[in-house]
Design a protein with these regions (language model features):
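Aromatic-lined substrate-binding rim segments of carbohydrate-active enzymes
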Residues: 52-56, 65
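Conserved nucleotide-cofactor-binding alpha/beta core module
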Residues: 130-132
Length: 439
């Protein structure tokens, strides 16, 4: 199929990648991210998780980004209470030399950013869903707005055309069932507020439906039987599919969006590597005129190898229907990684890694990954295995082996990549639809 041609004056959007740890950060930069966003230990929407950086790590992340010509944004986008203003200001003052902007969701934090002369972006949590809101936010000093996920493509185009401010839109990753992510379910069920970075993701779980009304027989006797309670299984009823915009990335670029945001600070380094590289290739192909539906299909298939909960087009082409919700209880990834061991030496001239096999064995022909905070993520096939002068077919647990490998470091973790167990579909075909039919 022939390539799709576009105006050569089209703006090339920034690819904004998530980083929950130094390995993911390195993977993002290696894969072509133009910018990275991360959080510290408080005041962000992943504050509950381990997917955050230390203050020392922030300085190192800033150095790495600047060496690669990439920007770095700090997420400080949770609700801030009165007693936390001083701590939030102290965090921003510390971060100022290391970041290009802060992503915020509180007008008090906006005031602090203005006082400290820190550029700030309005988080999607603030539901900027129209041009008047964008103009107001611009007037308050915002340099960018992350548009509400509820915006359709037509609405995005109109906001971009009329607001005169940088716009950022999510293009890939998890979607919250709540309006702009402002969910109260976790707080109601567990006392942990998603709006404070403490989401327990109850929407991803299965549910029981219990009949409250009591029924009686013809003689007026109460009926108490097991049918009064129903298990909604194996389906999920609130779990949204992941967004994937690769099939219509050209349309998003034509809309003039400034930055394409990939969700996933709590996801793995190989997820970041795979997804960022897919969007890098897609955006570059649109710019040079080589983008085709066949290329989009290939890139979608590539992203299916890593964590996702099936894919949908989000709300870009209309309000959500039943087909926007997943029937998968966990990841639908086509591949899984299994711990093999660690790198215990690397011979630079020979391009050989010495690996201690602590868990799963590796054999000739296996695909493995090496991951580390400086190495990032390398994935490659095992083409030879040796132990001293002995040529091996398999390196078993409790042994060691040397093998050809890209540059890696002592302490890097080694994984074997296997096909994932199949995920049986548990909902009827009427609940699913192809992405292609919607775009």
């Amino acid at each position: 199929m022939s390539a799709i041609c576009y105006n050569t004056a089209m703006q090339k959007p920034e690819i904004l990648a998530p980083a929950g740890n130094p390995t993911a950060l390195e993977a993002a930069l290696q894969s072509g991210a133009d910018a990275v966003y991360l959080g510290l230990d408080a005041f962000n929407m992943r504050a509950r998780s381990s997917a955050n950086f230390t203050r020392e790590g922030l300085a190192d992340a800033s150095r790495r980004c600047r060496e690669r010509g990439a920007k770095l944004y700090l997420t400080l986008n949770s609700i801030i209470f009165q007693g936390e203003l001083a701590a939030a200001e102290e965090m921003l003052a510390f971060a100022k030399p290391h970041i290009d902007a802060a992503i915020i969701a509180d007008w008090g934090v906006a005031a602090i950013c203005r006082r400290l002369s820190i550029p700030f972006h309005i988080s999607t949590q603030m539901s900027c869903s129209n041009s008047e809101a964008a103009l107001f936010m611009k007037a308050q000093g915002a340099s960018r707005v992350v548009l509400a996920r509820e915006c359709t493509l037509a609405e995005v185009e109109e906001i971009v055309r009329t607001a005169g401010i940088e716009t950022e839109c999510f293009v890939h990753g998890a979607q919250c069932v709540a309006e702009s992510g402002r969910c109260l379910l976790s707080h109601d069920a567990y006392g942990c507020s998603a709006n404070r970075g403490e989401c327990h993701q109850p929407c991803r779980r299965r549910f029981l439906v219990k009949a409250i009304d009591r029924f009686a027989d013809a003689d007026g006797n109460p009926i108490h039987d097991a049918d009064a309670e129903f298990e909604v299984t194996p389906h999920t009823v609130l779990s949204a599919k992941d967004l994937c915009s690769l099939p219509f990335i050209d349309k998003l670029m034509a809309a003039g969006i400034s930055s394409f945001k990939i969700e996933g600070r709590a996801r793995t380094a190989e997820y970041v590597r795979t997804v960022v590289s897919a969007y890098r290739e897609a955006v570059d192909a649109v710019m040079d005129g080589s983008f085709t539906p066949a290329l989009a299909d290939r890139l979608v298939e590539k992203t299916k190898n890593v964590f996702h909960r099936e894919f949908s087009v989000g709300l870009y082409f209309g309000r959500p229907g039943a087909d926007q919700f997943t029937d998968a209880e966990d990841s639908s990834a086509r591949q899984v990684k299994r711990q093999v061991g660690v790198v215990i030496d690397y011979f630079l001239k020979a391009g050989m890694a010495q690996v201690k096999i602590q868990d799963q064995p590796i054999s000739l022909g296996d695909t493995i990954q090496v991951q580390g905070p400086t190495t990032g993520v390398h994935e490659f096939a095992v083409t030879s295995l040796r132990r001293d002068e002995e040529i091996l077919e398999t390196a078993e647990r409790g042994t060691w082996a040397t093998l050809p490998a890209p540059r890696c470091r002592v302490g890097d973790r080694v994984f074997r990549i296997d096909p994932a167990p199949s995920h049986p579909r548990s909902l009827s075909a009427s609940r699913t639809s192809s992405m292609a039919s919607l775009v």
